[in-house]
Amino acid sequence: MEYKIEKWEAMDLLAHARDFQTETSEGEIPKFWDEYYANDAYRKIPAYLAVCAQKKTDKNKFRYGIGCKASDIEGVPEGFEILHIPEYTWAVFKCVGPMPNAIQDMWERINKEWLPTSEYERIPDYDLENYLPDDPASQDYVSEICIPVKKEVAEYENETVKNI
């Protein structure tokens, strides 16, 4: 699994967003992308980012948006919102293969393989997916999954030690 750890400054994203049920999101999010591209009003906004808000008020749903950095667009078009992403350290995973299967498979690998064994802990805030303007159905299509992380803190006999 190819990844890198990077520090990013805070940023604002312009997103067309909707709430999704956790249990049905894997099938519903690809439909949301189809709707995004089918609507001419949204063709004016480049869709090279997806953002998933992990701060949940209801554990069974989350907010997911499609869009771009707000600095790339003037104003906020109807149907869009600005999402402020704080400064974080990010784990950035390279994903290769056709969408949506490649990105869904990589999420599964991150959650089952990387997170349980890495020295990093996921910060439950915003996750990002970066998409290139190439053909997303291509076998060699490249995208990225970016999750905010921090070094895990280990406890030893009533003493807290921060991993460096």
Segments from the language model and where they lie:
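A solvent-exposed interaction/effector surface
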Residues: 1-164
